[in-house]
Each structure stands twice: as structure tokens, then as C-alpha cells.
């Protein structure tokens, strides 16, 4: 049985408004195991489900298998669960076929499959990159290129709130994209805490999430904010900071404290053309 894994992704900058996104890898895992079979079946945490994206991936790669998914990343939470699943599945298939794990090819395929299957508005190249590579990334999702990457040794707090995701009006988010330009500029400079704060103020205002959850962290000088299109909130910093924030956030839902992923989830090859020139 072949297996591969990928990380959760916490958001610094939502890519929906401008096409530029930023995220970081979190040590919450999705593991995909492949068992050769005459029939495609997908089991997610023990429950059989149909997966259009899995069908597209396996058919395009000429593989038939039973797909067993073990994931601790909640779906529809803003933590890149779909990106992690697609990353792990593509890597597992490539391993099964004895192919090189070229990060650029895998992540471009991830974005393409995600768009075709309708599980992402932007292709989520930022989430996919953080999910595979770990650390912090800034990406141009439209050109499917990385702008910068940064390592970080520390921890993350992840809040899964009691409330669910609201409606995402992506057109409205893009129409007022100028309001988030400061966050884009900060992310490109590697000022992730500032970018996260500006992004959170915008996304919470536009999608109706409570800003007070992030403000509880900001009051303590902690870098935190809304993740993806919500409803989860994430933070990064020292272990002590994350444990203190977990106590504060506990009233809003379940909180996990995990390491920020500091190495790729799989033994991937990272080619130079992966990066976009800032003037490109």
C-alpha cells in the first residue's frame, strides 16, 4: 500500500481579492493510502464517499485504486483540507507509479484539478504550496508561481469555532480589492503579522465573521487572524504564546496547538522556475 501526507494551511493573506495569497503549513495532517483495486472507492476517516476530484486525478493518471484518507483537517473550515487531500493523493499516485515528486508539477496539477472540480475559487496555489512545502509562502495564484518562501520555527494555534461558514461573495471581495492592497504589500515584504491583521480586518468585515476573536490575540501581541474564507482562526508564535491564546480562544470552540511545519511533507524536488520574479 502506497501512502503520502500533506499539511493543513493557515492563511496570512486570502488570495480571492487580488490573486496574491499567503499561507503557512501547520502540523495537522491528511494521509492518503492507495491500495490497487479494480474499482475506484474513496474512504474518508472510515466513511465511503464519492470524490469528483479523486476520480479526475486517478483517471488522468491512468490509475485505479482504493483511496483511504485519514485526515485531522476539518473540511470547509478554511484550513486547506481540499488542497491537502489533493496534494497527498497526487503524491501517492506518483509514488505508486515510480515517478519523481516535482513540487511545481504537483502544485500546478493541484490547482488545475481543484478548479475543474469546483472545490476552489482560485486554485488555492498558496494553500497547496504551504500544505506541501511547509513554512510560509507568498504566491501569485493566477500565474501559479511562488513569490517568496520563509522558514519559521514555532507553533500555531487553530480555532475551530462553534459557528459555521457563511456565504462567500467572491465577486464583492474582488470589487473592493483595493482595500487589501496594504496586506498584499506587507506579505510580499515578509511582514506576515501585519499582512494577517489587515487581511483579517477586511475578510471579517466582508464575510461577517467576528473580529473580536482575532482582537483577543492582538491584545496580547500575538499574530493571528481568520483563515481562508473562514470560519477557522489561526495564529503563530512561540509555544507559550499559543498555549495562552488557546485558553482565551477556548470559549469560542475547539483549539489545537501544533507546530508550524518547517519542512516539506514529502521528499519533493523544488525546481528554480517555481518562483515568479517580482516584476514578472
From Swiss-Prot:
Keyword annotations for this protein, in alphabetical order, are: Amino-acid biosynthesis, Aromatic amino acid biosynthesis, ATP-binding, Cytoplasm, Kinase, Nucleotide-binding, Transferase
- The answer to keyword Kinase applying to this record is yes
Describe the reaction catalysed, as an equation: shikimate + ATP = 3-phosphoshikimate + ADP + H(+)
PANTHER family, alphabetized: HOMOSERINE/4-DIPHOSPHOCYTIDYL-2-C-METHYL-D-ERYTHRITOL KINASE, SHIKIMATE KINASE
What GO biological process terms does the UniProt entry carry, in alphabetical order? amino acid biosynthetic process; aromatic amino acid family biosynthetic process; chorismate biosynthetic process
Q: Which GO terms describe its molecular function?
A: ATP binding; shikimate kinase activity
As recorded in Swiss-Prot or TrEMBL, the protein's gene is named aroK
Task: List the EC numbers from the record.
Answer: 2.7.1.71
Cite the binding residues for ATP. 74-84
Similarity comment: Belongs to the GHMP kinase family. Archaeal shikimate kinase subfamily.
Q: Which organism is it from?
A: Archaeoglobus fulgidus (strain ATCC 49558 / DSM 4304 / JCM 9628 / NBRC 100126 / VC-16)
Q: What is this protein called?
A: Shikimate kinase
Where in the cell is the protein located?
Cytoplasm
What would be one Gene Ontology cellular-component term for the protein? cytoplasm
Task: Please state the pathway this protein functions in, per its UniProt record.
Answer: Metabolic intermediate biosynthesis; chorismate biosynthesis; chorismate from D-erythrose 4-phosphate and phosphoenolpyruvate: step 5/7
Amino acid at each position: 500500500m502506497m501512502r503520502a501526507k500533506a499539511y493543513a494551511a493557515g492563511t496570512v493573506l486570502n488570495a480571492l481579492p487580488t490573486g496574491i495569497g499567503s499561507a503557512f503549513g501547520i502540523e495537522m495532517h491528511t494521509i492518503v493510502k492507495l491500495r490497487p483495486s479494480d474499482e475506484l472507492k474513496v474512504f474518508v476517516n472510515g466513511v465511503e464517499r464519492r470524490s469528483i476530484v479523486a476520480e479526475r486525478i486517478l483517471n488522468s493518471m491512468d490509475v485505479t485504486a482504493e483511496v483511504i484518507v485519514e485526515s485531522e483537517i476539518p473540511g470547509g473550515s478554511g484550513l486547506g483540507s481540499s488542497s491537502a487531500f489533493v496534494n497527498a493523493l497526487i503524491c501517492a499516485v506518483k509514488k505508486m507509479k515510480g515517478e519523481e515528486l516535482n513540487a511545481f508539477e504537483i502544485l500546478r496539477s493541484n490547482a488545475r484539478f481543484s478548479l475543474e472540480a469546483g472545490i476552489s475559487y482560485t486554485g488555492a496555489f498558496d494553500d497547496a504550496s504551504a500544505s506541501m512545502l511547509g513554512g510560509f509562502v507568498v504566491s501569485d495564484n493566477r500565474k501559479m508561481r511562488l513569490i517568496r518562501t520563509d522558514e519559521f520555527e514555532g507553533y500555531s494555534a487553530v480555532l475551530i469555532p462553534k459557528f459555521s461558514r457563511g456565504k462567500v461573495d467572491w465577486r464583492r471581495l474582488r470589487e473592493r480589492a483595493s482595500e487589501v492592497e496594504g496586506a498584499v504589500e506587507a506579505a510580499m515584504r515578509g511582514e506576515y503579522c501585519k499582512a494577517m491583521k489587515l487581511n483579517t480586518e477586511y475578510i471579517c468585515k466582508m464575510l461577517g465573521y467576528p473580529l473580536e476573536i482575532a482582537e483577543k490575540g492582538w491584545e496580547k501581541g500575538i499574530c493571528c487572524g481568520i483563515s481562508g474564507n473562514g470560519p477557522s482562526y489561526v495564529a503563530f508564535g512561540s509555544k507559550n504564546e499559543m498555549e495562552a491564546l488557546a485558553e482565551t480562544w477556548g470559549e469560542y470552540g475547539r483549539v489545537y496547538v501544533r507546530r508550524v511545519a518547517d519542512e516539506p511533507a514529502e521528499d519533493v524536488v523544488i525546481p528554480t522556475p517555481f518562483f515568479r520574479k517580482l516584476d514578472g
